[in-house]
Amino acid sequence: MKFSTALLCLLLTAASFSTFVLAQPDSVSIPITCCFSMVKRKIPMQKLESYMRITNSQCPQEAVIFKTKASREICADPKQKWVQDYMNHLDQKSQAQKP
């Protein structure tokens, strides 16, 4: 009887602690997109639709993810001149489309 009472107390304590941990906002797992390899060659500009910068501290390196019109995502090095030029072009294109 003493053993089952002790076990019940232990389980209740563990359950209350796990509820506390799950209620913490930092314990929520948010999916993170990271790039582990970069494209080596230029992508044809006419195939691109948009881009997204990846600067998350949990990723091994900074990157730019270009999204193509075919919905593919391609990682590129933001330090490369052509990548910067493409980002500027896409920014100007999106500004021109806004009324």
Curated annotation (Swiss-Prot):
Entry keyword Secreted: yes
PROSITE patterns xrefs: SMALL_CYTOKINES_CC
Modified residues (Pyrrolidone carboxylic acid): 24
SUPFAM superfamilies xref list: Interleukin 8-like chemokines (SSF54117)
SMART domains: SCY (SM00199)
InterPro entries: Chemokine_b/g/d, Chemokine_CC_CS, Chemokine_IL8-like_dom, Interleukin_8-like_sf
Signal peptide: 1-23
Gene Ontology terms describing biological process: antimicrobial humoral immune response mediated by antimicrobial peptide; calcium ion transport; cell-cell signaling; chemokine-mediated signaling pathway; eosinophil chemotaxis; exocytosis; inflammatory response; intracellular calcium ion homeostasis
Disulfide bridge map: 34-59, 35-75
A cellular component annotation (GO) from this entry: extracellular space
Location(s) in or outside the cell: Secreted
Pfam families, sorted: IL8 (PF00048)
Key words, A-Z: Chemotaxis, Cytokine, Disulfide bond, Heparin-binding, Inflammatory response, Pyrrolidone carboxylic acid, Secreted, Signal
Any GO molecular function: CCR chemokine receptor binding
Predominant place of localization: secreted
Function statement: Chemotactic factor that attracts monocytes. This protein can bind heparin.
Sequence similarity: Belongs to the intercrine beta (chemokine CC) family.
Subunit structure: Monomer or homodimer; in equilibrium.
PANTHER family: C-C MOTIF CHEMOKINE 8, SMALL INDUCIBLE CYTOKINE A
Name of this protein: C-C motif chemokine 8
Protein source organism: Canis lupus familiaris
Gene from which this protein is expressed: CCL8
